[in-house]
Regions:
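A short SAM/SAH-binding and catalytic strip from SAM-dependent methyltransferases
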Residues: 55-68
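Short glycine-centered segments of the SAM/dcSAM-binding site in methyltransferase folds
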Residues: 11, 83-85
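A short glycine-rich, Lys/Arg-flanked "PGG" loop and its adjoining helix->strand segment in the class I
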Residues: 70-82
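Class I SAM-dependent methyltransferase SAM/SAH-binding core
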Residues: 1-46
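A short acidic, Gly/Pro-enriched loop at the edge of an enzyme's catalytic core
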Residues: 45-57
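Short N-terminal helix/helix-N-cap motif within the alpha/beta-hydrolase-1
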Residues: 20, 67-71
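C-terminal alpha-helical "lid/dimerization" subdomain adjacent to the S-adenosyl-L-methionine
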Residues: 87-145
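C-terminal lobe and adjacent flexible extensions of AdoMet/dcAdoMet transferase-like proteins
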Residues: 145-162
Length: 162
């Protein structure tokens, strides 16, 4: 969170399905003296926010756990302002067999990870179909991405339709 400490005029909203994770985030923010952070327990598949509410949507290690990934992608797109940035990272399958086996044998039974999973290629296709200026990479089984929600006029010029 050190970067967040420099964003004194930013309004930061943290949402997690797990009350335990929200508690940990709240404690960390308090230790750091952050004042501009709101915490809310909720489901990314049904975000409790108006359309075009956020300049940035950041998802760290979430999409591999979400039970309804399609709803999560739709909702993050919906709440992001045109011209806003969607970024994050999460597990992708097919990059390291050892990690794939660990996920299947350990994390899925514990309900920490929920199939189906993206591959690097499927994530690229998905993000390029929804966003512009897609930057995507991976370090073994963790993919990272940064992309922009284009403004409607820009999308129309490119021949895409929302």
């Amino acid at each position: 969170m050190p970067l967040y400490q420099t964003l004194l005029r930013a309004d930061i909203t943290c949402l997690d399905y797990s009350p335990d994770m929200m508690g940990q985030a709240r404690e960390k923010a308090e230790r750091m003296g952050l004042q501009n952070v709101q915490f809310r327990q909720g489901d990314v598949g049904a975000l409790p926010y108006e359309d075009s509410s956020f300049d940035i949507v950041l998802s760290l290690n979430g999409f591999h756990a979400f039970p309804d990934k399609e709803a999560a992608y739709r909702e993050t797109f919906r709440v992001l302002k045109p011209g806003g940035t969607f970024c994050g990272c999460f597990y992708v399958s097919g990059e390291c067999r050892r990690t794939d086996r660990l996920i299947k044998k350990v994390y899925e039974p514990m309900k920490f990870f929920t199939p189906p999973y993206e591959t690097v290629q499927s994530l690229k296709v998905r993000l390029e179909g929804m966003y512009a200026d897609v930057q995507l990479g991976n370090v073994k089984s963790i993919a990272w991405f940064v992309c922009k929600k284009v403004k409607y006029a820009e999308k129309m010029e490119e021949g895409h339709h929302e």
